[in-house]
């Protein structure tokens, strides 16, 4: 191995960005095939390649950061900037969905009956499952902060407990959201209301699944003693992401469920 005289990580060539992009193409094309032709082959193939890519890419990052020591303070600083920029890009993603919702709801067209919700749409009661979902996500925000503080204080047992509770709450939220979708009287094809509702809440639901997976990886890593009180950027990034998901849900709840109904 050559001697390195700088603090930066020269990343080796990796196939995972390419396989990840291909899996994303398969999943999006597969969703179109599933929605229009009721064929699940492509979307399942996309999910499989995505899971395989995710596993191997995460394995490489863990190997580089934990076992090879490539994640120096300078590299960690760069990773932090990267995560912040990624979350900002996600904010703009959701801004587009909120824009579509408010554009349609603040000045409803005659085709919608000149009112919001549109004529014939029976919105979900914001005081039932959506309120429970809000409580679940707010509680998970508390438990992830508890996990972070426990890690900083070197309390491994409490960190694992808090992280497990957070992941469980994330899974519970996903199940509640799935049951809500199943029971909704309208679908994604029911005009602009159905489109904006399912696109915004569905995209948020996808982020909850991604965040839960991220936290589950952190849980497994903590079981193997990968984190210390001063070297745990993987967990820190997951916690930031989870707080972002929390905040987006509050905006969704107030805008789409409460005001929009």
Swiss-Prot record:
It is a multi-pass membrane protein. One of its GO terms (molecular function) is cytochrome-c oxidase activity. It holds the Pfam family COX3. CDD domains: Cyt_c_Oxidase_III (cd01665). One of its GO terms (biological process) is mitochondrial electron transport, cytochrome c to oxygen. InterPro entries: Cyt_c/ubiquinol_Oxase_su3 (IPR024791), Cyt_c_oxase_su3_dom (IPR033945), Cyt_c_oxidase-like_su3 (IPR000298), Cyt_c_oxidase_su3-like_sf (IPR035973), Cyt_c_oxidase_su3_a-hlx (IPR013833). The chain crosses the membrane at residues 16-34, 41-66, 73-105, 129-152, 156-183, 191-223, 233-256. Residues 35-40, 106-128, 184-190, 257-261 are mitochondrial intermembrane. Component of the cytochrome c oxidase (complex IV, CIV), a multisubunit enzyme composed of 14 subunits. The complex is composed of a catalytic core of 3 subunits MT-CO1, MT-CO2 and MT-CO3, encoded in the mitochondrial DNA, and 11 supernumerary subunits COX4I, COX5A, COX5B, COX6A, COX6B, COX6C, COX7A, COX7B, COX7C, COX8 and NDUFA4, which are encoded in the nuclear genome. Belongs to the cytochrome c oxidase subunit 3 family. Component of the cytochrome c oxidase, the last enzyme in the mitochondrial electron transport chain which drives oxidative phosphorylation. The respiratory chain contains 3 multisubunit complexes succinate dehydrogenase (complex II, CII), ubiquinol-cytochrome c oxidoreductase (cytochrome b-c1 complex, complex III, CIII) and cytochrome c oxidase (complex IV, CIV), that cooperate to transfer electrons derived from NADH and succinate to molecular oxygen, creating an electrochemical gradient over the inner membrane that drives transmembrane transport and the ATP synthase. This is Cytochrome c oxidase subunit 3. It comes from Dugong dugon (Dugong). The gene is MT-CO3.
């Amino acid at each position: 191995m050559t001697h390195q005289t700088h603090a930066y990580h020269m990343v080796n060539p990796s196939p995972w960005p390419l396989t990840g992009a291909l899996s994303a193409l398969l999943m999006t094309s597969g969703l179109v095939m599933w929605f229009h032709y009721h064929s699940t082959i492509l979307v399942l193939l996309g999910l499989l390649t995505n899971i395989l890519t995710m596993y191997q890419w995460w394995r490489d990052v863990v190997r580089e950061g934990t076992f090879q020591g490539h994640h120096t303070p300078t590299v960690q600083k760069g990773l932090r900037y990267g995560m912040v920029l990624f979350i900002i890009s996600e904010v703009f993603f959701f801004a587009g969905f909120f824009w579509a919702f408010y554009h349609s709801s603040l000045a409803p067209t005659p085709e919608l009956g000149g009112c919001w919700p549109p004529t014939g749409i029976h919105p979900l009661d914001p005081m039932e499952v959506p309120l429970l979902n809000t409580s679940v996500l707010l509680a998970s925000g508390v438990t992830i902060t508890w996990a972070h503080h426990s890690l900083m204080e070197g309390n491994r047992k409490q960190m694992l407990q808090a992280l497990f509770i957070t992941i469980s709450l994330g899974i519970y939220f996903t199940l509640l959201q799935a049951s809500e979708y199943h029971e909704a009287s309208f679908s994604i094809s029911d005009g602009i209301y159905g489109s904006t509702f399912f696109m915004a809440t569905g995209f948020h639901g996808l982020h909850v699944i991604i965040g839960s997976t991220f936290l589950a990886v952190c849980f497994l890593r903590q079981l193997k003693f990968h984190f210390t009180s001063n070297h745990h950027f993987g967990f820190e990034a997951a916690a930031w992401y989870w707080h972002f998901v929390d905040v987006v849900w509050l905006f969704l709840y107030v805008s789409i469920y409460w005001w929009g109904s």
